[in-house]
Amino acid sequence: MNLPEHGGNLIELSKKAGCNPKEILDFSANINPLGFPEWLRPFLHSKIEDLISYPDPNYTSLKKKIHSKYGICTEQIVLGNGASELILQIPFVVQADYALIAVPCYSGYKEAISLLKIPCIEVTLKEEKQFRLDINELRDVLKSKPDQKALVFLGHPNNPTGVTLDKIEVLKIVQEFQNSVFVIDESFIHFCTNESSFLKDKTENMILIQSMTKILALPGLRIGICYASPLICSNISKRLPTWNVNSIAASVYEKAISDEDYIENSKQNIKIWKEKLIYDLSNLEFLNLFSSEANFILIKILDNKNIFDLTQELLIKYKIAVRNCENFSGLSKNFIRIAVRTPEENKKIIDAFSNIFYGTRQRLKSRKKTPSIMFQGTASNVGKSILTAALCRILSQDGIKVAPFKSQNMALNSFVTLNGEEIGRAQALQAQAAKILPDIRMNPILLKPSNEKDSQVIINGKPLNSMNFKDYDQYKPIAFEEVKKSYDSLASEYNVIIIEGAGSASEVNLKKNDIVNMKMAEYAKADVLLVGNIDHGGLFGSLLGTMETLTEWERKLVFGFIINRFRGAKELLKTGINYIEEYTNKPILGIVPYIKNLKLPEEDSLEFKSGALDDTSKLEERLDVVLIDIPRISNHTDIDALRAEPDVRVRIVRTVEDLGEPDVLILPGSKNVISDLNHLYDVGLVNKIFALSRNQKTDIVGICGGYQMLGKNIFDPYRIESDQGSIQGISLLQIETILEKNKSLKRVFATHIPTKTEVEGYEIHHGKTKSIGNTRVILLNEKAEELGHSDPTGRIWGTYIHGIFDKDEFRRKYLDQIRIRKGKSPLVKVQVSYNLEKSLDRLARYVRQSLNINLIYRKLGLG
């Protein structure tokens, strides 16, 4: 039986396991489980142009950096293609009479010694002493050969035991036997929390070896360093080929020297993870663990199970690789070594051990995460919300209990649940797609911009307060805890969760306190689908660019890509698809076409502000409906149902010049009524609206904030919206509004008195409005509370009800009144059903046909 000399050979391991190398969970190689530094990928890209030149054979820049950092003279530094290359040269340079090693130890020492064919004496580290070196045993050997030069190899910490040396005792023996040369291998020293390197105490007869391979998690890059006397370094260098270290490796090492935070963070995380791993392993009575100061643990199997059979079962059945230590001199045949990995990975090996030895899988204390898929985007407005709704509807159609989730939503279009709690409008639509009721747990944090700097923060459906970016950024850790609670609670009740990210996944300036994109995906253990909107242009560049800003752990979460809103022949995308799949090793999971007349409300104001929703076609025989755009518009989706009508054209107007004489003018809701009313005064629209009220042709409608603007005065005694305190309204309705501290949030069912039809919607406002003159009550809820007023003519009216036009019967009766006033025949019958169910089914049909649903289902464990 030939055992590998080293761990980490994934190619060989995967052959034995019959799987892809990426499927192997490798505990056999002692590599930093945090992965390489976040700066590595972009840094490598910046250095690619250096590959057209040979490296500096003296590695001057790197050696100067080492000298600046550690005070080591450049003549005392040799760089190697990994620490192993340097170790192999040492016996030839030292020319000792014999070698002395403490076993068990790294097999590379013996390999190097054997090349020179000098005698090798082994001092056995005793199991009963936890494999800690007894320095006197070394001393006895050295004393027994006073006229001979010894080459002593010692690991600090030692591999595979993880035990460090007693620095004081070692320095004594180094001084005592100055004719001998002591090699201190510190390849794992960076993992020791109580690091006590020999670097500052190095003597003339000492050679210090360090490796950046392990701590940087870059075993494929190869970089090692030797610190020794100028003579030894010179002689080692002469044995090495010119340019033995490539320029990329040298540049990475030079960069890493300055990144103390990465190394310290690695130490602290590994310390915590190792303690938990040791605790869990200690609860398995068939294992005996040995104390380790490194990032790996030596384990003795107390059961009679054959070690080879055990390692093979772990590999083949569980795809877990561990280091079989049978070929370590100084160890019996029942030892293995495992690396410390992430908590999730460590739990897998605990479960595997438990299952192998007990015959039953140990039950986890924490519940397994509910399967989830997350849509993230290359930018805002790429279709994340709609695709989330589509997948919710597809899963629901297939009988799977599914719910949507978005940890944090910044939008002006909110929705009020039946319990009077506020969430993003998009999550309400997604809930409908999933055929469930909207729930605040689907959107625990809602941010509603109130001015250029501040947003109202709504936590679990209730307003908290207004915060600027800095204040909210500091609050985010607390907010994320609320997010986790909501997610866990929601996920416990459903079979699948479909998560929506926010904005772009590539916002490197926002990643530190991210709670809505990759950090959320990591918490939920969600596979990420990255969405790009081909309508934006530069699709493949945006997909590739986004991937390049992601750290390695973030990239691993990305399952594949979706091309959205495509128009044209798919064959035109073939070259780009091949390029992106080859470059990223991630699949394109579908090409979703541009779907015309989808008739679903937009999530936020991006599409609205872009002008894409502005109908500038010829009016012909249609009614001309104008929505006044204001800087802090909210719930502009109130007009979506009107936009669907065949006899209506909806225009978005921002200036007096574009207004004209519409049949209906709508003042929308506002997140800051006083500020937006000031804006209307400033651009001259107030005077124009007042003039239209006199033409006997135009209906003027105010919804929520727009309703308040139509009145005589708006009072803000608590300075909720500004320091102005009050503002005069447009004075088209004899009403006054006082902005109260508490926000009114509730679903509404009411009767429109003039048409005697039922309407429904929701209230979201701070205001309390009352009539102060000649007005008519036009809307009453089931409690006979007044929810809207008009002037005596009925042409000027307002209401607090968002979604008032969504009911088909009311919308048609209202539009027919306008038609009759214009001398047109009423259409009487409902022309279009503003039925989101039909639209959602249509959306699901397109998306099901466009995506690789079978592959997505398999990822969710549903295939």
UniProtKB/Swiss-Prot annotation:
The gene is cobDQ. In the N-terminal section; belongs to the class-II pyridoxal-phosphate-dependent aminotransferase family. In the C-terminal section; belongs to the CobB/CobQ family. CobQ subfamily. Pathway: Cofactor biosynthesis; adenosylcobalamin biosynthesis. Its EC number is 4.1.1.81. This is Adenosylcobalamin biosynthesis bifunctional protein CobDQ. Keywords: Cobalamin biosynthesis, Glutamine amidotransferase, Lyase, Multifunctional enzyme, Pyridoxal phosphate. HAMAP family: CobQ. PROSITE patterns: AA_TRANSFER_CLASS_1, GATASE_COBBQ. Residues 622-810 form the GATase cobBQ-type domain. CDD domains: AAT_like (cd00609), CobQ_N (cd05389), GATase1_CobQ (cd01750).
